[in-house]
From Swiss-Prot:
Name of the protein: Transcriptional repressor NrdR
Key word Iron present: no
Function: Negatively regulates transcription of bacterial ribonucleotide reductase nrd genes and operons by binding to NrdR-boxes.
Stored HAMAP family: NrdR (MF_00440)
Lineage: Bacteria, Pseudomonadati, Pseudomonadota, Gammaproteobacteria, Lysobacterales
Domain of life from the UniProt record: Bacteria
PROSITE patterns per record: ATP_CONE
Biological processes, Gene Ontology terms: negative regulation of DNA-templated transcription
Keywords: ATP-binding, DNA-binding, Metal-binding, Nucleotide-binding, Repressor, Transcription, Transcription regulation, Zinc, Zinc-finger
CC cofactor: Zn(2+)
Domain spans labelled ATP-cone: 49-139
Residue ranges crossing the lipid bilayer per the database entry: none
Family: Belongs to the NrdR family.
Length: 173
């Protein structure tokens, strides 16, 4: 690797550390010509599948779009940044392990919804409302009821639909 300071071609690795998630290696290097030290990050480069949009056009996968979808769904929600990043990584991982050269955008949306469902139920319903083009309150109610049916039963678990109805009544009253 060329030294970023003097452009000399010979550098040596003096330390290597694997990141917490095991996906990146940080290498500390030293230039043999000028003695300057610098760090490099090494990751495996796997080609992600192309995304086939609903109109049939194809585009390269863009992780920023996935992140933007999470950000919109979770706006003003108390979800930790590291949890959102982990969810984005999970979507990317699902695409990588699919082994497909092309993936329909609808499948990416489903991956995002599955991660949101685990992360934040309100964010999940927000995303689902746009993704599935909800047209009225009945669509929201149906999705919330489906979500409640799938939740593990617990006396501590709040009833989503009941909470929504109670909030609606408070705002009207």
């Amino acid at each position: 690797m060329h030294c970023p300071f003097c452009q000399h071609a010979d550098t040596r690795v003096i330390d290597s550390r694997v990141s917490e998630d095991g996906a990146t290696i940080r290498r500390r290097r030293e230039c043999e010509a000028c003695g300057e030290r610098f760090s490099t990050m090494e990751t495996v480069e796997l080609k992600l599948p192309a995304i086939v949009k609903s109109d049939g056009t194809r585009e390269a996968f863009d992780q920023r779009k996935v992140r933007a979808g999470f950000d919109r769904a979770l706006q003003k929600r108390a979800v930790a940044e590291d949890k959102i990043e982990a969810a984005v990584r999970a979507v990317v991982h699902q695409l990588r392990i699919s082994g497909e050269r092309e993936v329909p955008s609808i499948k990416v949306g489903e991956f995002v919804m599955n991660e949101l469902r685990k992360l934040d139920h309100v964010g999940y319903v927000r995303f689902a409302s746009v993704y599935r083009s909800f047209e009225d309150v009945a669509d929201f109610r149906e999705e919330i009821e489906k979500l409640e049916r799938d939740l593990p039963s617990s006396t501590e678990q709040l009833q989503l639909l009941g909470d929504v109805i109670a909030l609606t009544k408070k705002k009207k009253g």
